[in-house]
């Protein structure tokens, strides 16, 4: 229901690079249950109750002097953004530089809404135990599409998630609007967490933070390329050119050096063109209206120009 809000709570410029790579979970929100809980869920869906549970067994070390070591009933699936690991769920999308306060606010509010909905049903129930079983089965039936125990990095999962109707929000700029949807305003307003104005102000601040971060990165890249990389390459091409001339004067074959010179000169030309493009779009971005318009320009124009130069 609130996958877009969870994704937004973990959004920052650095996470745009991290999610889906570098030992990080993908940007698609799903839940990994593992074999043990998955077995319980399947029992509940098929019969309405769980009568047994899998266990992890013992670790066979082959050393008789060591005591028995119990194994987890499941692995930890590092490709899942929301995974059950032994006795808890882990929300792994938050970047290392970010505070967990924001994601905790979102998680706790979503859980509060779920508890409130359950209470509305159970408080009116004539038979509490029967109502609990029915409610659990209903929730699992309605939301089992978010359960995925496979490889979250695979292209197959991206296609499968699309079939299931799960959002794949790839960037911070595309995630921020989740804060100000009618659904989000109703959720946070119901529990007096944030007003509509407070959500809008937070969205505006996030847009500005994104724009500032990308602007700093772009200017740093321009500075590095213009003052360090290109001058170093120019110096090296001069050395290669001198070498080619010297080898030819000596009557030897200079084809290897000449080929290297041609390749590097070509790359230097491409680098200079990419640098000029980045300089132009960065300057253009500075003139855009601050907030959503500017941050979207940074994401869809400046970031690709940075990738081109990189």
What are these regions (language model features)?
Residues 2-310:
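Acidic, glycine-enriched catalytic cores built around paired aspartates
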């Amino acid at each position: 229901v609130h996958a877009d809000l969870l994704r937004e709570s973990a959004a920052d410029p650095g996470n745009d690079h991290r999610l889906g790579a570098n030992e990080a979970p993908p940007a698609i929100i799903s839940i990994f249950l593992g074999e043990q809980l998955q077995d319980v869920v399947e029992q509940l869906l098929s019969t309405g109750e769980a009568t047994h549970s899998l266990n992890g067994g013992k670790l066979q070390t082959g050393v008789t002097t060591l005591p028995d070591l119990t194994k987890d009933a499941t692995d930890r699936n590092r490709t899942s953004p929301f995974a059950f690991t032994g006795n808890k769920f882990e929300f792994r999308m938050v970047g290392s530089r970010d505070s967990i306060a924001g994601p905790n606010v979102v998680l706790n509010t979503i859980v509060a809404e779920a508890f409130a909905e359950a209470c509305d049903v159970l408080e009116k129930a004539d038979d509490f135990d029967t109502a609990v079983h029915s409610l659990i089965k209903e929730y699992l039936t309605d939301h089992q599409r978010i359960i995925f125990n496979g490889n979250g990095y695979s292209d197959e999962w991206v296609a499968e998630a699309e079939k299931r109707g799960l959002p794949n929000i790839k960037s911070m700029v595309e995630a921020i609007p989740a804060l100000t949807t009618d659904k989000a305003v109703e959720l946070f307003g119901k529990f007096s967490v944030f007003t509509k104005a407070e959500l809008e102000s937070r969205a505006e601040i996030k847009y500005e933070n994104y724009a500032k971060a990308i602007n700093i990165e772009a200017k740093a890249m321009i500075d590095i390329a213009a003052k360090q990389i290109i001058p170093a390459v120019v110096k090296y091409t001069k050395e290669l050119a001198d070498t080619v001339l010297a080898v030819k004067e000596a009557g030897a074959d200079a084809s290897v050096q000449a080929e290297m010179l041609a390749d590097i000169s070509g790359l230097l030309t491409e680098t200079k063109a990419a640098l000029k493009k980045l300089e132009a779009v960065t300057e253009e971005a500075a003139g855009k209206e601050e907030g959503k318009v500017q941050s979207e320009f940074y994401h869809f124009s400046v970031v690709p120009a940075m990738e081109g130069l990189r």
